[in-house]
Amino acid sequence: MAEVRNYTFNFGPQHPAAHGVLRLIVEVDGEVIQRIDPHIGLLHRATEKLAESKPYNQTIGYMDRLDYVSMMANEHGYVLAIEKLLGIEPPIRAKYIRTMFDEITRILNHLLWLGAHALDVGAMTVFLYCFREREDLMDCYEAVSGARMHATYYRPGGVYRDLPDSMPKYKPSRWHNEKAVKKMNEAREGSLLDFIWDFTARFPNLIDEYESLLTDNRIWKQRTVGIGVVSAERALQLGFTGPMLRASGVEWDLRKKQPYAAYDRVDFDIPIGREGDCYDRYLVRIEEMRQSNRIIRQCVEWLRKNPGSVMIDDYKIVPPQREVMKRDMEALIHHFKLFTEGYIVPEGEAYAAVEQPKGEFGVYIVSDGANKPYRVKVRAASYPHLAAMNEMCRGHMIADLVAIISSIDIVFGEIDR
């Protein structure tokens, strides 16, 4: 009689549902998963080592490229750690701008996650809907920094510049005539804050649109309910954070428990799940988008009423304005020194963590008193979630593997670093 044994195969790294360069060695008994061994490192770019070889003010851009879907949230963790070492506090207006863009980033991340998750499970329409809204938010990035993705907008001591009075506008093309473009630009005639206010007024109805396609959909529930369950106790033991931990029923959010920026000044709720399965992770992230929308509206209201500085006034850390440099030799010298040598950070160690869309993103910096870090260690938010793949997938079907991978929201830029 022929011997019956388990079958082992590779899932990825060239797989449309691998979310990057994920390689899994999967052991199956028929269609049932017995064991999963994740292999990482295929997107390793030595980010931490690169940060040790450049001045502090030249390494902020590396953070954008870690989790390249949550760009400004990564920057926030890094600049908070530098600010701790320097002993500086950004102006309150800069804190509100950071809070607003952290939440814009959260919505950007969750929209991409929702579209990709739905596409992996078989619902293509949602993917197209989500990218429609992402375009508007990408334009907010472009308005403040000139870049749609890698913004480098946050700086130690504040933000690069104040919010602009105009928005990027669409132009007539082969695909859109002047009449269509005029309608598309209706919300873009005012300032960035006017555009964001208009977006946040429309967005709750758009979330309802996504939910009408998925939340009560019979096939969606069959693919996600009871799949990849992690209990609250086990989620804590595995080091889960963010939506993955909250979906298991643990009310933990750094924005509430360890407030930073202006989170102690805004009102919002922390959504939590009960079952800890793929469906609860979906529901938690959907509600997080609603709460982010709520926070953004509060920030817009405050920023409209309270003009002011967005950067500390210290030429040892912040470059002087161009107009000042033209008439002040000392300011010109400071500018030259900052962009050739950077600034000296006092000797010491600092850890700063932010509630990034995927979980707790932490940056630990060791300074030896030079103009560049002695050591930088990044805590990737989704690393512990990937490490739990074996536990979440065991006993499920191969088709469920795809649903579980997409539900944990992984990006290999930050996992491999």
UniProtKB/Swiss-Prot annotation:
Origin organism lineage: Bacteria, Pseudomonadati, Pseudomonadota, Gammaproteobacteria, Legionellales
Region forming the signal peptide: none
Name of the coding gene: nuoD
InterPro entries per UniProt: NADH_Q_OxRdtase_suD (IPR001135), NADH_UbQ_OxRdtase_49kDa_CS (IPR014029), NDH1_su_D/H (IPR022885), NiFe-Hase_large (IPR029014)
Organism: Coxiella burnetii (strain RSA 493 / Nine Mile phase I)
Top-rank taxon, per record: Bacteria
Class of enzymatic activity (EC top level): translocase
UniProt protein name: NADH-quinone oxidoreductase subunit D
Any Pfam family: Complex1_49kDa
Main subcellular location: membrane
Subcellular localization, as worded in the UniProt entry: Cell inner membrane
